[in-house]
């Protein structure tokens, strides 16, 4: 639902000029690494103390060692941050519109905020309040990444996508 709402909001105010193709190839690595980060983060949360349903003395958890899966999660985040920094550098170097550069910086800022919360919760015994803030931050980061992805995406018309133009056809958005 968050992705659908973000796409709908972004498409409603689209600039009719698509970004140059030299910037488009960054959108999928960033989006893919973000998805991998969220999945790995879900595994970390599902393996930790604030997971599953509580039934007396039994708490259902995923069978992963928290330090190991947290390292996997952190490694994916580091790769994502490096790709975002590279993208921002490329956007600055090629004179991309300020809005695209700003959204790239927004993604980077949200990732840095998330990393700070994640490390703090890991080294302070995973307090439940920080887990909640980290999940909220993951949602904000996902929205920022989708917004940035859409900025770097071609228009549906440029792809030859005419679906949704007629009233009897379903409207399908192209990410």
What does each model-found stretch correspond to?
Residues 1-175:
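Polytopic transmembrane helical bundles with strong interfacial aromatic enrichment
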């Amino acid at each position: 639902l968050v992705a659908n709402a973000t796409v709908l909001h972004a498409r409603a105010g689209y600039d009719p000029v698509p970004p140059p193709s030299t910037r488009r190839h960054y959108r999928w690595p960033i989006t893919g690494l973000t998805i991998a980060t969220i999945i790995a983060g879900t595994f970390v949360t599902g393996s930790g103390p604030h997971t599953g349903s509580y039934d007396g003395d039994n708490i259902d958890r995923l069978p992963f060692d928290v330090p190991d899966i947290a390292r996997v999660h952190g490694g994916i985040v580091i790769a994502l941050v490096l790709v975002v920094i590279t993208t921002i550098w490329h956007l600055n170097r090629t004179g991309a519109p300020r809005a695209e550069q700003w959204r790239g910086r927004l993604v980077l800022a949200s990732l840095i905020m998330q990393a700070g919360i994640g490390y703090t919760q890991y080294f302070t015994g995973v307090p439940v309040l920080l887990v909640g803030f980290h999940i909220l931050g993951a949602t904000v980061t996902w929205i920022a990444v989708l917004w940035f992805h859409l900025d770097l995406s071609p228009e549906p018309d440029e792809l030859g996508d005419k679906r949704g133009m007629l009233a009897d056809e379903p409207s399908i958005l192209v990410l």
